[in-house]
């Protein structure tokens, strides 16, 4: 199944506070597989170079524990329990064993822009025997560039967004408004897909990029039926996160 042949991707799995299901957890991943929707997860490296499924740099928000994930060994990370529910942090390999190719998987590689040692070969090693539909993506173009140089067989994409001044000092207002620096990098890297922020999904420079490269467009994070409509208008596949029954019904209807 190609990455664009799905109604949507559950952002960090199907998680909800109502049932004590935490983002990026094994339960959230299982629920998405059972619902038949694609899954978007976050991955970063342990200190011993094992890809772990977790979003934040530090453990505290989701576990109540102190510590930075990239400074910990995988075995220690896997023993950490989330603050709610019964799940522990899992590895990418655990996630692949849960999904088993039943639905497409988008793997966002977190670099946190910290200049940590390269992680790309570890990702390639874990994914080399996985036959299920999946793609690797990152905000950090240097990660995608290194994956390409290492010959990663996985589809590779960029995560892009609006360019607020505080995050993009030193660029012109035109560059900030258009997002052209990101899109130029996407062209240079010849990416296989792009995931762009829903609030900027109708950016004409983005439309031109998609038209020229003829690649799938995903949009994050869709949290309402109005946002879903905006994504649909641009033929963007939603990366969604919601307890909105109406939105889930719309996604089911489109499948």
Q: Predicted regions: what is each one?
A:
Residues 1-255:
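Phosphate-group recognition and catalysis centered on beta-loop-alpha active-site segments
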């Amino acid at each position: 199944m190609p990455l664009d042949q799905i109604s949507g991707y559950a952002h960090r799995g199907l998680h909800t506070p109502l049932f004590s299901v935490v983002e990026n957890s094994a339960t959230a991943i299982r629920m998405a597989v059972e619902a038949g929707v694609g899954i978007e997860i976050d991955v970063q490296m342990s200190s011993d170079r094992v890809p772990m499924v977790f979003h934040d740099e530090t453990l505290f928000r989701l576990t109540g524990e102190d510590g930075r994930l990239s400074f910990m060994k995988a075995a220690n990370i896997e023993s950490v329990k989330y603050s709610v529910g019964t799940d522990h942090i899992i590895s990418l390999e655990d996630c692949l064993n849960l999904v088993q190719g039943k639905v497409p998987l988008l793997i966002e590689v977190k670099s946190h822009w910290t200049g940590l040692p390269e992680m790309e070969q570890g990702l390639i090693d874990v994914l080399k025997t996985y036959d299920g539909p999946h793609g690797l993506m990152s905000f950090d173009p240097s990660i995608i560039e290194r994956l390409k140089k290492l010959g990663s067989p996985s589809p590779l994409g960029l995560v892009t967004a609006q360019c607020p001044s505080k995050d993009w000092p030193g660029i012109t207002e035109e560059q900030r408004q258009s997002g052209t620096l990101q899109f130029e990098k996407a062209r240079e890297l010849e990416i296989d897909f792009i995931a762009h922020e829903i609030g900027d999904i109708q950016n004409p420079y983005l439309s031109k990029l998609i038209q020229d490269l003829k690649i799938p467009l995903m949009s994050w994070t869709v949290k309402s039926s109005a946002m879903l409509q905006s994504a649909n208008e641009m033929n963007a596949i939603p990366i969604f996160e919601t307890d909105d029954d109406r939105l889930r019904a719309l996604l089911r209807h489109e499948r």
